[in-house]
A protein has these predicted regions:
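Zn-dependent metallopeptidase/amidohydrolase metal-coordination segment
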Residues: 157, 183-242, 246-254
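Short beta-strand/turn micro-motifs at beta-sheet edges
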Residues: 108-113, 216
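Acidic-enriched catalytic cores of C-N bond-cleaving enzymes acting on peptides and small amides
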Residues: 1-4, 14-104, 114, 129-150
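Short proline/glycine- and acidic-rich turn/helix-capping motifs at secondary-structure junctions
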Residues: 153-165
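Glycine-rich, aromatic-lined ligand/substrate-binding cores of catalytic
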Residues: 111-122, 136
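Hydrophobic beta-strand positions in extracellular immunoglobulin-like domains
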Residues: 7, 125-127
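Predominant activation on well-ordered alpha-helical scaffold segments within soluble catalytic domains
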Residues: 24-31, 174, 238-241, 245
Length: 255
């Protein structure tokens, strides 16, 4: 849910600064976002993920994680599940509605001696499946305060989506992975990015973002996104093809 934040005030000559100019109103409001992690919540998929990770230690660890999540202490639950600081950092966005300030606009460098009447900020928001459009706007507004206006930017809103891991296809994925990877367990997971699921799930089609891949060799960085590190290891291509073929074949034969 991408939003635009607008601060307004009287514009005037820069020789007369004030505390209530638009740029300062906006700056003060944005600081209230803190680190951008706005609302903690464990959706069913990520509850199952933490429970599965913790269960690798013991059944007690899994029960303890469940108890901590019931109290809404998601950061503590990740640590209790056994994640190291880097693991917590990477997993944390999947337990929060988040807001990242990505662009600012105010005034004109050619008129640097003029205090602008408007100042704008653009926020890329990522919302969990239980959040709504208005709910997120209200959440952002509650952090920013009343000095600014918050609007959805160019109608760029997509609901958070989640497929049930109780679906039959998920069971086949678990079975094939266990067969081909020495009994490895599949951990349900949520994606913090935007995918074609937003077009398919509303039409009743469950979507699972599953890309089979072996661990990368020591010293090789994992793939990233939107840069020259958005890649796949070539030796994983035939492995992925074989696993996916096996999954589709088994699933269709049982249908």
């Amino acid at each position: 849910c991408r939003v635009m934040v607008t601060a307004r005030a009287e514009g005037r000559h820069a020789s007369q600064p004030r505390r209530d100019i638009a740029t300062l109103k906006l700056a003060r409001s944005l600081c209230r976002l803190g680190d951008g992690y706005l609302r903690p919540h464990a959706i069913p998929t990520m509850r199952a993920a933490l429970r599965t990770i913790a269960a690798a230690q013991s059944s007690y660890a899994a029960q303890r994680v469940d108890a901590i999540l019931e109290q809404g202490r998601v950061d503590e639950a990740m640590v209790a599940a056994g994640l190291d600081p880097e693991g917590v950092r990477r997993m944390r966005p999947l337990f929060y509605d988040t807001a990242a300030v990505t662009s600012l606009a105010a005034g004109n460098p050619e008129s640097i001696n003029v205090i602008p009447a408007n100042a704008l900020a653009y926020i890329d928001g990522r919302i969990l499946p239980d959040q709504t459009r208005q709910g997120f706007i209200d959440l952002v507004h509650s952090h920013l305060g009343n000095d600014v206006q918050v609007d959805v930017f160019r109608e760029q809103y997509s609901a958070g989506l989640e497929s049930s891991f109780d679906a039959p296809i998920f069971g086949v994925i678990e079975e094939v992975v266990a067969d081909r990877c020495d009994g490895a367990k599949v951990i349900p997971w949520q994606c913090a990015g935007s995918t074609d699921a937003k077009h398919l799930i509303p039409r009743g089609l469950p979507v699972f973002g599953f890309i089979p891949s072996k661990p990368l060799p020591p010293g090789m960085n994992e793939a990233g996104a939107h840069a020259n590190n958005e890649r796949i290891w070539l030796e994983n291509v035939p492995f992925a093809l074989e696993v996916l073929y096996d999954i589709v074949t088994r699933f269709c034969l049982r249908a």
